Curated annotation (Swiss-Prot):
The active site is at E273. Its EC number is 2.3.1.48. This is Histone acetyltransferase type B catalytic subunit. The modification Phosphoserine is found at S187, S340. The record marks W196 as: Interaction with histone H4 N-terminus. Its main location: nucleus. Belongs to the HAT1 family. Acetyl-CoA binds at M238, L239, I240, Q245, G246, Q247, G248, H249, G250, A251. PANTHER family: HISTONE ACETYLTRANSFERASE TYPE B CATALYTIC SUBUNIT.
Amino acid sequence: MAALEKFLVEYKSAVEKKLAEYKCNTNTAIELKLVRFPEDLENDIRTFFPEYTHQLFGDDETAFGYKGLKILLYYIAGSLSTLFRVEYSSKVDENFDCVEADDVEGKIRQIIPPGFCTNTNDFLSLLEKETNFKPFGTLLHTYTVPSQTGGETFTFQIHKADMTCRGFREYHERLQTFLMWFIETASFIDVDDERWHYFLVFEKYNKDGATLFATVGYMTVYNYYVYPDKTRPRVSQMLILTPFQGQGHGAQLLETVHRYYISFPTVLDITAEDPSRSYLKLRDFVLVKFCQFLPSFSRERLLQGFSEDMAIQAQQMFKINKQHARRVYEILRLLVTDMSDAEQYRSYRLDIKRRLISPYKKKQRDLAKMKKCLRPEELTNQMNQIEISVQHEQLEERFQELVEDYRRVIERLAQE
């Protein structure tokens, strides 16, 4: 019996080891590429990878059943016409311990629209016709970015489009697939809802004497109704594709979108849906740029504390709501505060902490009411003291995080 048990344990271990050889990390198996020239197909420098694949491949972000798995998703840089192919060196035998390989191709087909290429020749034929691709919608803004190596500058355009633009619906179906790889909680929107607005970033470049355009990124904005006669545009999705990140395109896009809506008297303010920390930093930078020269945000006014005039002027001039205006004030006040001066530093720190402590105070009041019903008075007081101690630590930690974020905004502002 002992020999049999030993055999079964060893057999199970051997099987698990064998199966592990057929597990692939989908974050590295999926290879993305934006193709401008035929030689880009073989250029590994052009390849980039997803940050997330859990929506298709589960929380462990793995595909089972393959060795050397490669999931190729190559896009023509402008039109995003797609080459999709699955490659691997070996596949698990269907009879191997009653297991089957994951349907990798089926999972990818869930998010990419039909009409993609499966062989290179068809893809290259479409690439030859790329000169016919032009940006959709209305041109809102043109800007340039200098080359990181110096000398050359690159030209970019931001357009506003909608579903009435010829070919845009199909283009958007291809574009939105990138969301699944780079936004953790991404989902596709209802494009038949006319309240969606689309803002697109393109690079303008030359190829063999012709002018072409490459997709850089995009933003979707939903226009909510605000009683009785206003709207509140809310940023829903924003993505700058990996090869273009770190070049300032996010700030250009967000600033352009804000300036677009500022021109409409019916717009109350501009918000964002579940903003990430990186988005908040970007918005901080853009809104501070807007407000830094407003009279209500002068050095003298900033040192006096946040005022209703600041909130009103930020809303009237730039459609910034009171909560965001308060954050702008905190950044600009840090800019004019001498942090080496003990009194100025103390005044600034207390001002920020007064805002941060408000939700804690409410929580404390609610907790005290509940504990009076459930605990003796002495125990309640003791637990409240512990709670307060923890709150002070959390407040200080949060304050330091904010100051660090604010300093980065100020440093970036100084580089403008």
